[in-house]
Amino acid sequence: MSIRDWPAAERPRERLLEQGAISLSDAELLAIFLRTGVAGKSAVDLARHLLRRFGSLRRLLEADQLTFTRQLGLGPAKYALLQAVLEMARRHLAEKLHRQSALENPLVVRDYLKSMLRHEPHEVFGCLFLDTRHRVLTFEVLFQGSIDSTTVYPRQVIKRALAHNAAAVILCHNHPSGICEPSPADRVVTRRLQEALELIDVRVLDHFIVGEGDPLSMAEYGWI
């Protein structure tokens, strides 16, 4: 049965408009994105099929172009649309982050860093550069490593902090394994960067590790 033949109260789009997006399941949200189904499957049926194939909504959203476009009911146009939606979401978070102090908006900081790093298949190290009022100046990815590790050079971090006239920084990197627990090497690198940046009067406010779930704040655990 086509979704158009469903009672209005059960149709995903109508329910979203009436009750808000939060009331919908992953399959229903994906069905709205898909708009139409395929022969023998409504958009909701197709969405459920795709979620089973990928294992989760996150894995579907982070799939590369080749993997995505090979799936039933998907293609280059849908992939382009998805990338546009994801980029708009990242830019929305970036705008929210730039409007006020990062310390006043810790949840936005977490969401932004998660959107920037969680999809990376290899370990990536980045930095949020902040002004004297802890407003975000810019975000930069500084180092990229293998799937297991990355080499972080304090001299390069200092160089970029000076280039942006930063007064403070928030460090971040991802764990492609999904486990957010900091390794001994993570703690060593954090201490080295703290010591190096202190020489130019730049404070390290936090170091976030991005994996599955919410990013881990080393500052909250007393490791900074």
Swiss-Prot record:
Q: Which residues form the MPN domain?
A: 102-224
Q: Name one GO biological process term.
A: proteolysis
- Enumerate the Pfam families for this protein: RadC (PF04002), UPF0758_N (PF20582)
Which residues participate in Zn(2+) binding? 173, 175, 186
* Location of the motif JAMM motif: 173-186
Q: Which family does it belong to?
A: Belongs to the UPF0758 family.
Protein name, entry field: UPF0758 protein PFL_6051
Q: Upper lineage ranks?
A: Bacteria, Pseudomonadati, Pseudomonadota, Gammaproteobacteria, Pseudomonadales
